[in-house]
C-alpha cells in the first residue's frame, strides 16, 4: 500500500516536471516579430514567427529595451512625450515603427530659435545588431535625430527653413540612414509636421 502511494507521487511529480519542461521549451513568436535566443549568455539564434523550440534552463529569450516616444495622451498638443518599451516578452518588431519624439529646439544660421515638430519612421532590419550593437536603440535614434536636426537647421536661415521643410526632412533622413545602418535599422522617412519659431 505504502509502495503504491510512493509510486503514484513519483509518477505525478515526474509528469508535472515533464509538462513544465515542455511548457518552457515551446515559444510562440507572433507574426511580424522575431525573438533572439541566448545559450548560456551568448547569442545563439533568431526565432522566426510561429512555434519554436528552445532548450529550457540552457537557452533563454533576450528581452531588450527599445524605447520609443508617444505624445502625452492627456494632452495631445503637448510635446512632452511618454517613453515606452517597444519590446514585450522578447518580441522584436520587424514592422515599421513610428516615433513621435519630444520637442526639439535648434538655432538657425541667423540665430532664430526653431522648434521643429517631427515624426520619424524606422524599421529594425537586423535585430542582432539592434540589440547587441547599441544599448537602447530607440533613445539612440532619438538622440541622433536631435543632433542631425540641429546640424541641418544650423546652416539655414529662417526663410530657407520655412520654405524647405521637405528638403530638411530628406536631408535628415539620409543623414540618419547612414549613421543608423550600423545599428541594424532602416530609417524609412522623417516628416516635419510643423516648424515654430520663438516669438
What are these regions (language model features)?
Residues 1-199:
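N-terminal hydrophobic membrane-entry segments
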Amino acid at each position: 500500500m505504502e509502495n503504491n502511494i510512493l509510486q503514484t507521487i513519483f509518477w505525478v511529480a515526474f509528469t508535472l516536471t515533464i509538462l513544465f519542461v515542455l511548457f518552457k521549451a515551446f515559444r510562440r513568436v507572433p507574426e511580424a516579430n522575431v525573438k533572439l535566443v541566448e545559450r548560456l549568455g551568448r547569442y545563439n539564434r533568431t526565432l522566426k514567427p510561429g512555434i519554436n523550440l528552445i532548450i529550457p534552463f540552457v537557452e533563454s529569450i533576450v528581452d531588450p529595451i527599445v524605447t520609443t516616444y508617444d505624445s502625452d495622451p492627456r494632452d495631445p498638443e503637448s510635446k512632452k512625450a511618454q517613453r515606452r518599451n517597444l519590446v514585450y516578452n522578447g518580441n522584436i518588431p520587424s514592422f515599421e515603427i513610428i516615433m513621435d519624439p519630444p520637442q526639439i529646439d535648434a538655432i538657425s544660421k541667423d540665430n532664430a530659435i526653431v522648434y521643429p515638430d517631427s515624426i520619424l519612421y524606422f524599421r529594425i532590419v537586423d535585430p542582432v545588431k539592434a540589440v547587441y550593437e547599441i544599448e537602447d536603440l530607440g533613445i539612440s535614434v532619438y538622440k541622433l535625430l536631435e543632433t542631425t536636426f540641429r546640424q541641418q537647421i544650423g546652416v539655414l536661415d529662417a526663410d530657407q527653413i520655412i520654405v524647405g521643410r521637405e528638403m530638411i526632412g530628406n536631408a535628415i533622413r539620409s543623414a540618419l540612414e547612414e549613421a543608423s545602418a550600423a545599428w541594424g535599422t532602416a530609417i524609412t522617412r522623417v516628416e516635419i509636421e510643423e516648424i515654430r519659431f520663438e516669438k
